[in-house]
Amino acid sequence: MAQELKLGFKASAEQFDPRELVEIAVAAEEHGMDSVAVSDHFQPWRHNGGHAPFSLAWMAAVGERTKRVQIGTSVMTPTFRYNPAVIAQAFASMGCMYPGRIMLGVGTGEALNEYAAGFQGEWPEFKERFARLREAIRLMRELWTGDEVNFDGEYYHTQGAYMYDVPEQPIPVYVAAGGPVVARYAGRAGDGFICTSGKGADLYQEKLIPAVKEGAEKAERDFEAIDRMIEIKISYDPDPQLALENTRFWAPLSLTPEQKHSVNSSTEMERLADELPIEQVAKRWIVASDPDEAVEKVKFYTDCGLNHLVFHAPGHDQRRFLENFEKDLAPRLRKLSV
């Protein structure tokens, strides 16, 4: 049975100031997008020209200015500089104000954001970061019941805690995964799953999607009920040279996960990224000036079973991208099946 295809837009918080980013999200809804997602960084990946608006303030502002788009984080780390109980409160409040439109996308975190906000000591290994994430999700979901919560976990604790304003529709939690371990957990416990494009066909076909299915089956859940989101890095423009050059600002995406997770300053991230040649930077992106070529490359991801495509455009003229997307790409994409 074919599943509904959703088209979303990634609001580039590392690239635009808060007000401009709100206006871009409003434009995304006007141009037909089904969702808008925002990253949650305390520090951007670039020191020069970078931005880092607070995701929760942005989400509330976008909620007031829009009517139908889903609004969420892609992604937030609710485990170090944030107390997950407070994050639960924030998302419950937004869920009350914008019913059925708020989602919480979560990940295990990067050192860049946490050290700057006061984290001390050696950056935790993946095992601890993943354990913190699972525990944080359990705590938040308990709080969203509205019942008294006395939570005594390994990392987080509450005492006689109540969530007094709880939305009628539960807040869906989307789990970001770059490998099969977390992807299995997303299938087991997530309302949604998030991954990013441009990392090699076998990752999606042989590791991530099969792991989500495996997790869902073991938990006796319906795989089709899990919203499977992918951030698609796309630099589409009728001008081929502009399509290529637009990727330069986002060179940090082409660093290895090991480099990104351990770097603890924006200046160092920028230095490493700017050493990369434009050809290597562009490899993470679908760079296209022909709409049929662009859609054919996107089709790979729907063929893998991903049903919620969130498009991240690298250029500084986001309205130009949205106009071209609505005119050239959306009609073709809407014909794809999952």
UniProtKB/Swiss-Prot annotation:
Binding annotation for coenzyme F420-(gamma-Glu)n: 40, 77, 108-109, 113, 178-179, 181-182
InterPro entries: F420-dep_G6P_DH, F420-G6PD/mer, F420_G6P_DH-rel, Luciferase-like_dom, Luciferase-like_sf
Active-site residues from the entry: 41, 110
EC number: 1.1.98.2
CDD domains xrefs: Tetrahydromethanopterin_reductase
Record-listed substrate binding positions: 196, 199, 260, 284
Reaction catalyzed: oxidized coenzyme F420-(gamma-L-Glu)(n) + D-glucose 6-phosphate + H(+) = 6-phospho-D-glucono-1,5-lactone + reduced coenzyme F420-(gamma-L-Glu)(n)
GO BP: any one term: carbohydrate metabolic process
Keywords, in A-Z order: Carbohydrate metabolism, Oxidoreductase
Keyword Protein biosynthesis listed: no
Pfam families recorded: Bac_luciferase
Assembly mode: Homodimer.
Family: Belongs to the F420-dependent glucose-6-phosphate dehydrogenase family.
Function text: Catalyzes the coenzyme F420-dependent oxidation of glucose 6-phosphate (G6P) to 6-phosphogluconolactone.
Protein name: F420-dependent glucose-6-phosphate dehydrogenase
Lineage: Bacteria, Bacillati, Actinomycetota, Actinomycetes, Mycobacteriales
Gene giving rise to this polypeptide: fgd
